[in-house]
Amino acid sequence: MADNLVIVESPAKAKTIEKYLGKKYKVIASMGHVRDLPRSQMGVDTEDNYEPKYITIRGKGPVVKELKKHAKKAKNVFLASDPDREGEAIAWHLSKILELEDSKENRVVFNEITKDAVKESFKNPREIEMNLVDAQQARRILDRLVGYNISPVLWKKVKKGLSAGRVQSVALRLVIDRENEIRNFKPEEYWTIEGEFRYKKSKFNAKFLHYKNKPFKLKTKKDVEKITAALDGDQFEITNVTKKEKTRNPANPFTTSTLQQEAARKLNFKARKTMMVAQQLYEGIDLKKQGTIGLITYMRTDSTRISDTAKAEAKQYITDKYGESYTSKRKASGKQGDQDAHEAIRPSSTMRTPDDMKSFLTKDQYRLYKLIWERFVASQMAPAILDTVSLDITQGDIKFRANGQTIKFKGFMTLYVETKDDSDSEKENKLPKLEQGDKVTATQIEPAQHYTQPPPRYTEARLVKTLEELKIGRPSTYAPTIDTIQKRNYVKLESKRFVPTELGEIVHEQVKEYFPEIIDVEFTVNMETLLDKIAEGDITWRKVIDGFFSSFKQDVERAEEEMEKIEIKDEPAGEDCEVCGSPMVIKMGRYGKFMACSNFPDCRNTKAIVKSIGVKCPKCNDGDVVERKSKKNRVFYGCSKYPECDFISWDKPIGRDCPKCNQYLVENKKGKTTQVICSNCDYKEAAQK
């Protein structure tokens, strides 16, 4: 029997760590939190100094029993949950359940799950940091007080199943505020004039800049005509040449927030998926002969700090691969995390390259690991050097300007370019070699009419970035927050951008009127600052809770008395129930919209909303092929005559037969490419656009 018991959150983490520690250590998983506030009631005694009433989470009884059994037999119990506030709270709850001594140095933390890091952490165990535990407790209790007080009011006055929360309500507000900006936006006309110029055999473009040596706004066609009328022939002169060398520094290695943003832009990952895959990479990957190793550092961090060891290893790799000129000469300026002294998200070893790891990883794991690895290595590389040139092209009172740039030294851009840098302004644009006094010929002067555009709706990446910039919540809460506002049907995604629903706007208006603090950005930011102060030991958690709740409970009482009941009418489905003849209506469920009988609860008939794709079923030739959704919300295609006909296809039938085998053809999508393939043989053809 092992003398030492080590408790971690997950079986994957337990499996990895046990291999490093040897036979004297038994490592088991708590499967996440074991204690929490009860779901069936508030669980916070507001009359007794906000004392929380923790209970064992339903279903965790057998886990707790197993933990107690092993703890009783062990000489030492070590709590090795994650190195953040959440992990500290899990360790504290475990110590309470297992009745461990408060002063016992039994807490071990490591930022990466590698043999050296884990073994080193066990040489330096410490006591549980109660300030971190209290900060997490305060957040949990705050969220419970808000959710369990506002939600019942919304159920009673608006609709059952609704919720509000400190972070989700602000996120919803951002989406709605942006939608209102778009609705209220009034487009304004403006014009541009672009000229195509020739010098010897080279052609290049330039934009109109000045009239009579001053900026001249082209608001109307009349303004444009004034400029074109002033032109005299096609000859222009180069009146100024400005050459500069520009340095582009690489982006910092990833924090939780920037990882979520970049994975959304480059990999099309939702925030939740990014965190799930990152967790797998952190907890350990089986590298066969090398054993199980955590490939990245802890993925919940807001720090860009890098350890000296990691920097040295990256420098060695860059020198060997690209040469010493590609290594960074900059002094570190990494941002220390607001919450804890973590490192940035980086590979646990630069020498484990994505290509070397590919055979051990799933497709998603490989893509995310490659992103993290390249971003980190690039952050340790030399800046790129760009040569820029600006040409002023003049005729009389009219001046055009051409801007060009070439890459003199690629530096970090050899390996990685941040998505937001993939813009036209950062790409090469070569101009002919011209000097002041040279003559060029205008081959085309092209005016173009434009209208100002409203601000774009939020993508998931932009919403995450805005929440972080405003300091709303923690990066680790963004994924569940975005999930919640979608599951509650407060927002929907259209072309990968968030649009508020009618229900979302109704809920927002009620929260805005009766609980203004909850959606106030400044209030939410101040609350995060107070939570940080609790973690630093500068203020007690009970004082923070009391400062909030004393005024909040008055808002709840006012809402219960004054909020008017709102009737949300169901959308007619346009057909009658085949069971009782009542009109069918559109309802929103967990997996999207469906049809239900308006005579509910007397009639409980429901049916899926199906969309015909205009193709006859290739199996029965009687029904139509319709689009359906699986329980996991994945689109598939079936026959409208189901269950009489059981035709099903994940790919979209196109209504034509294969010229080789006469089976039906389907549209097959892989990434950004679409092609037509046979459902039976190897026939392929390009998809028609």
Curated annotation (Swiss-Prot):
Gene3D superfamilies: 3.40.50.140, Bacterial Topoisomerase I, domain 1 (3.30.65.10), Topoisomerase I, domain 2 (1.10.460.10), Topoisomerase I, domain 3 (2.70.20.10), Topoisomerase I, domain 4 (1.10.290.10). The active site is at 298 (o-(5'-phospho-dna)-tyrosine intermediate). Its cofactor is Mg(2+). Residues 328-357 are annotated as: Disordered. It holds the Pfam family Zn_ribbon_Top1. Its EC number is 5.6.2.1. GO terms for molecular function: DNA binding; DNA topoisomerase type I (single strand cut, ATP-independent) activity; zinc ion binding. Mg(2+) binds at residues 9, 82. Residues 3-113 form the Toprim domain. Residues 163-168 are annotated as: Interaction with DNA. It catalyses: ATP-independent breakage of single-stranded DNA, followed by passage and rejoining. It is an enzyme of class 5 (isomerase). GO terms for biological process: DNA topological change. The record marks 33, 139-140, 143, 148, 155, 300, 488 as: Interaction with DNA. One of its GO terms (cellular component) is chromosome. Keywords: DNA-binding, Isomerase, Magnesium, Metal-binding, Repeat, Topoisomerase, Zinc, Zinc-finger. Releases the supercoiling and torsional tension of DNA, which is introduced during the DNA replication and transcription, by transiently cleaving and rejoining one strand of the DNA duplex. Introduces a single-strand break via transesterification at a target site in duplex DNA. The scissile phosphodiester is attacked by the catalytic tyrosine of the enzyme, resulting in the formation of a DNA-(5'-phosphotyrosyl)-enzyme intermediate and the expulsion of a 3'-OH DNA strand. The free DNA strand then undergoes passage around the unbroken strand, thus removing DNA supercoils. NCBIfam families: topA_bact (TIGR01051). This is DNA topoisomerase 1. It comes from Staphylococcus aureus (strain MSSA476). The gene is topA.
